[in-house]
């Protein structure tokens, strides 16, 4: 099976866990998607599947190359395409790769059994921003005649007589590809293809996001929602009692 799919960011809300704590969550429209192309190691050098997000798109909005690519297998017009890796879920890798076929639908039930996902999107654009807003500089003095928002010195004129690469300066802020890792899955709605994850996701509402299974899922932490808490005082007393 493939390790992810394409979705849309619906918006944010909040939920209460079993302990009564508020959890900020993001609702994602995960799919429905369709497999538009199958990449193989023999032909393409690697195993992957090209996936398209099924949504209402006029054929006039697509190029002839896109229409020809989709028309080979009588697929619906899709505008957003993305490649996802194929992970083995069968007794052998060959059998698992053979299960992925062009035209198959990919729905939100792909993430059943998974606890965490990685979400990739494009962050909101903030335009041209100064160093205080862009890099969280403290700024200068707020007294009369001073310039609070100015960045200050960016290099000496004597030596090195240049500006070092990577110098934090004013410039375009946002509109960057951002990946948020290990977002906990709090709910799945199969009927509406909705995925509820804990935390924030880059991008505005209705932004296109790529949802994949977590590459490095974290271990359960003490006191985390859904895990049992341990009283350190009682635990130390039990340890002393065992030694006696």
Swiss-Prot record:
One of its GO terms (biological process) is translation. It comes from the Bacteria. SUPFAM superfamilies: Translation proteins. GO terms for molecular function: rRNA binding; structural constituent of ribosome. Keywords: Ribonucleoprotein, Ribosomal protein, RNA-binding, rRNA-binding. Pfam families: Ribosomal_L3. Residues 235-244 have a biased composition (Basic residues). Residues 215-244 are annotated as: Disordered. The keyword RNA-binding applies. GO terms for cellular component: cytosolic large ribosomal subunit. InterPro entries: Ribosomal_uL3 (IPR000597), Ribosomal_uL3_bac/org-type (IPR019927), Ribosomal_uL3_CS (IPR019926), Transl_B-barrel_sf (IPR009000). Belongs to the universal ribosomal protein uL3 family. Part of the 50S ribosomal subunit. Forms a cluster with proteins L14 and L19. One of the primary rRNA binding proteins, it binds directly near the 3'-end of the 23S rRNA, where it nucleates assembly of the 50S subunit. This is Large ribosomal subunit protein uL3. It comes from Koribacter versatilis (strain Ellin345).
